Amino acid sequence: MLTVNALIEWIGNEAQGESVIERILWLDEMSDLTYVIDVNANKLPYAKTISEYKVALDTEEAIMLDKDPFSRVVDEELLSEKAKAIRDRAWEAISSIVILEPEIYYPRERAKHVKTVAQKYGLSEKVIYKYLKRYWIRGKIVNALLPDYDRCGGRGKERNSKGIKRGRPRKHADIVGDGINVDEEIK
């Protein structure tokens, strides 16, 4: 049974990395049409037929994934104010157009709506498309727009400088010196 937000993995030659995972964004049983997005590619949604999925699932060319790699439980109280502000700003920008299904999946209609929203909120069209793709790929939920701060940096890891000074070179290095890297001896 196909549903919105279901993840379908097309089994290809996995040794060559040809496996594709698609998320179903919209279904219309009457016209045998669905819009999907490849979760591993930075591309926009495209149309496929529902019957194509049914045949692929029956012949095991594709499987329905039980676990969503993008789902994460988020405690609202543990989010920083900055992360909430980023999410809310992105949601405010795209909330009026993501509800326009299936129209938002038609390239010409989507372009018109994106242009309107970009002008209204003073953002570039590229940023609006980035928000839309992130929203669709991560499961059509508002928290999909949260920044990935938890995946940034190497908290607790020691940096290896190899003798080269890290950071921007000083403007007046000839007067104040080149600067140094902080290591265990200096700490």
Residue locations for each model-derived region?
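Secondary-structure boundary/capping micro-motif
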Residues: 1-187
